[in-house]
A protein has these predicted regions:
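Bacterial N-terminal signal peptides
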Residues: 5-19
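N-terminal secretory signal peptides that target proteins for export/translocation
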Residues: 1-2
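Soluble extramembrane regions of membrane proteins in the secretory/endomembrane system
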Residues: 18-101
């Protein structure tokens, strides 16, 4: 193969790799930090709505809570169980807690 052919092949492979990377749908994220309340429920609902509208492949929730209202916690659990996309909850960063989760 000539140098020109090798260079052209390299550029084609690079373009294909970049195209494949940009084609993947995004992963949405939301951070919940504090007491679980009706405001937290609304935050989760908005994050799910946005993630689904953006055609995200998943929603990642970063959670750090001492707990909160049982009614809000149960409503959040129902929303997550009925979500149209996968939801991943990460208790973090290190030292974080999830008392009502």
């Amino acid at each position: 193969m000539t140098r020109g052919a090798v260079a052209s092949l390299g550029l084609l492979l690079l373009a294909a790799a970049v195209s494949a990377q940009t084609a993947a749908p995004p992963v949405a994220t939301v951070q919940i930090d504090g007491v679980i309340s009706p405001v937290t429920l609304r935050l989760v609902e908005m994050a799910l709505t946005r993630a689904q509208a953006d055609k995200a492949q998943a929603l990642v929730i970063q959670l750090d809570t001492p707990g909160g209202l049982e009614r809000s916690m149960r409503a959040i659990c129902q929303r997550l169980l009925n979500a149209e996309i996968p939801v991943i909850v990460w208790v973090g960063p290190t030292g974080a807690r999830a008392a009502s989760a």
